[in-house]
Each structure stands twice: as structure tokens, then as C-alpha cells.
């Protein structure tokens, strides 16, 4: 089965909607960019699944960023995506991390910033504290604050695969919904192994075999980096001229690296001169 897909589903006999995402190749591309400690591999997987689930709730074309920051040994973990389910991500850390480190161990006094940037319209940003025991609970708190709709989030990752599930009461329905509470209890019985080995239809049947579930066509999820020659050239043009000359004098080139995919863009003295002369340059990617 394709292990990089998101499925939406509805319950015909309940005012509740759901999503299920399963990631493998895209997840591997994110965590293979650096030698991440095991705990960060898991965190990035959960963050990817959460971002995919969040993206599927958007009703516009545009971008989303889910960013974790704090004053702990991990200063940043972020997944960027868009309405096409194209994701990329990175984390930064400065100390050895235990495999069983908690969110507080990783980020100290941390917070999650979710930024929605529509192609048309105003940007929206929501901030919640990383003061819950799990990332899933923090994402649930975001929904409680932003949409004020009862929402359940389940996230899993093991360094090889990542997955997540989402349940939410349909808008305009009563906040107290016994169907939602019942379905949340059923969903809470899901095991990571089931999400990693079964297709979506089998997972939903195993969880909700007594419910009437309508499963929609899958949506592909992929890794896509937005780095380019042009962006790297633009970054060089923001540097001070003296700094550029010093780098060229010492190294003979300026090397721009992408921390998301580790692509390298190399500009020699001729490239840089052409860049400032007419805004164009020939560059080499390695």
C-alpha cells in the first residue's frame, strides 16, 4: 500500500468527521537530512503527521507552518506544508538528548506556533504552550482555543513510519456530543503497529466496525523542499559587500546549504560578480 496518504472520512450516523494519515517515504526524507537523535526522529514524525492532519482541515490554498520553540536543548522543530500536502521540516538541537526525553526536557519553557498563510487573505497565527505531556495534547489545545470544537488527535512515529488520526465534531453541532465521546474512546484503542501495517480501510473497520463510515479517496502526501538557485542568490544579495569579499578571499566561493534537504548551491567570484552586475548568475548544485 502507499504509505504516504491522507484519508478523510465521515460517520453517516454521527455528526463527526475524521482523518487518518500514514507516512513513510516523506518522513524518511525529512529525518535523513541530518543525523537526528532518536527522540527527534519520533518528534518530527509526530509533527509531520500533525501538520498533515491540520492541513487537511484548511479551506483555502496556501501554506501552513507548525513550529515548536523553547529555551531547552532543542531550540526549534518545524514542519512547513501547503494545501497540496507537500511537507518539509527540520529541527535544531545543541545537546545530547535522551531517547525518553519529554517535551519539557526538549524545549524547556516551550510553545507551539501554528501559522496559516492563505494565497489570498490575511495570515492567521495561533500560539499554545508546550505544557502538555504529549504533542497530540498540545495540538488538541490549539483546536480548543482556535476553533472551540471538541477535537481528538492521535500521533505515532518510530523512526521508520509516522501516522496520525483526527476526530472533530462538525461545525454548528452541539459541543456536548455523546457520539463524539464514544468515537473518541474507540479511536483511543488504536495501536501504532496497526497504523503502520494496515491500510486505511482496514484500520477504520477495526476501530469502527459497528459504525457507518464513509471513506473518501486518498490524498497523496509528499516531501517537497522549496530551496532553489534563485533563493540562494537572493540571500547572498542581502549580505554586506565586505562580508562577501572576505568569504571569497578565504574560500574562493560562497556555499549556500539548505537545512531541509541538504542541497548545496555554490557561487564562485564570477557568479557573485554577475549576480550584482545584472541580477543573474550561473550556479552549481551539488
From Swiss-Prot:
Disulfide bonds join 225-227, 258-261. GO terms for biological process: protein refolding. Transmembrane segments: none annotated. It is found in: Cytoplasm. GO terms for cellular component: cytoplasm. Pfam families: HSP33. Keywords: Chaperone, Cytoplasm, Disulfide bond, Redox-active center, Zinc. InterPro entries: Heat_shock_Hsp33, Heat_shock_Hsp33_C, Heat_shock_Hsp33_N, Hsp33_helix_hairpin_bin_dom_sf. GO terms for molecular function: protein folding chaperone; unfolded protein binding. Gene3D superfamilies: helix hairpin bin (1.10.287.480), Hsp33 domain (3.55.30.10), HSP33 redox switch-like (3.90.1280.10). It comes from the Bacteria. Under oxidizing conditions two disulfide bonds are formed involving the reactive cysteines. Under reducing conditions zinc is bound to the reactive cysteines and the protein is inactive. Redox regulated molecular chaperone. Protects both thermally unfolding and oxidatively damaged proteins from irreversible aggregation. Plays an important role in the bacterial defense system toward oxidative stress. Belongs to the HSP33 family. NCBIfam families: PRK00114.1 (NF001033). This is 33 kDa chaperonin.
Amino acid at each position: 500500500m502507499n504509505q504516504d496518504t491522507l484519508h478523510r472520512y465521515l460517520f453517516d450516523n454521527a455528526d463527526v468527521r475524521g482523518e487518518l494519515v500514514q507516512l513513510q517515504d516523506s518522513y524518511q526524507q525529512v529525518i535523513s537530512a541530518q543525523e537526528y537523535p532518536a527522540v527527534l526522529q519520533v518528534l518530527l514524525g509526530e509533527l509531520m503527521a500533525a501538520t498533515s492532519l491540520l492541513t487537511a482541515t484548511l479551506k483555502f490554498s496556501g501554506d501552513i507552518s507548525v513550529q515548536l520553540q523553547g529555551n531547552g536543548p532543542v531550540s526549534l522543530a518545524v514542519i512547513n506544508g501547503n494545501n497540496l500536502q507537500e511537507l518539509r521540516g527540520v529541527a535544531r538541537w545543541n545537546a545530547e538528548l535522551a531517547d525518553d526525553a519529554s517535551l519539557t526536557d526538549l524545549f524547556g519553557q516551550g510553545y507551539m506556533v501554528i501559522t496559516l498563510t492563505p494565497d489570498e487573505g490575511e495570515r492567521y497565527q495561533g500560539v499554545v504552550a508546550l505544557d502538555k505531556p504529549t504533542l497530540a495534547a498540545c495540538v488538541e489545545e490549539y483546536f480548543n482555543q482556535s476553533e472551540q470544537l471538541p477535537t481528538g488527535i492521535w500521533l505515532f512515529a518510530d523512526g521508520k513510519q509516522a501516522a496520525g488520526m483526527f476526530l472533530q465534531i462538525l461545525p454548528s453541532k452541539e459541543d456536548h456530543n455523546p457520539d463524539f465521546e464514544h468515537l473518541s474512546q474507540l479511536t483511543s484503542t488504536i495501536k501504532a503497529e496497526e497504523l503502520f501495517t494496515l491500510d486505511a480501510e482496514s484500520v477504520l473497520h477495526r476501530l469502527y466496525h459497528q459504525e457507518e463510515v464513509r471513506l473518501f479517496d486518498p490524498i497523496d502526501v509528499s516531501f517537497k523542499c522549496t530551496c532553489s538557485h534563485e533563493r540562494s542568490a537572493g540571500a547572498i544579495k542581502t549580505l554586506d559587500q565586505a562580508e562577501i569579499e572576505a568569504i571569497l578571499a578565504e574560500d574562493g566561493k560562497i556555499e549556500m546549504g539548505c537545512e531541509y534537504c541538504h542541497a548545496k548551491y555554490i557561487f564562485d567570484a564570477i557568479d557573485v560578480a554577475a549576480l550584482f552586475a545584472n541580477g543573474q548568475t550561473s550556479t552549481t548544485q551539488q
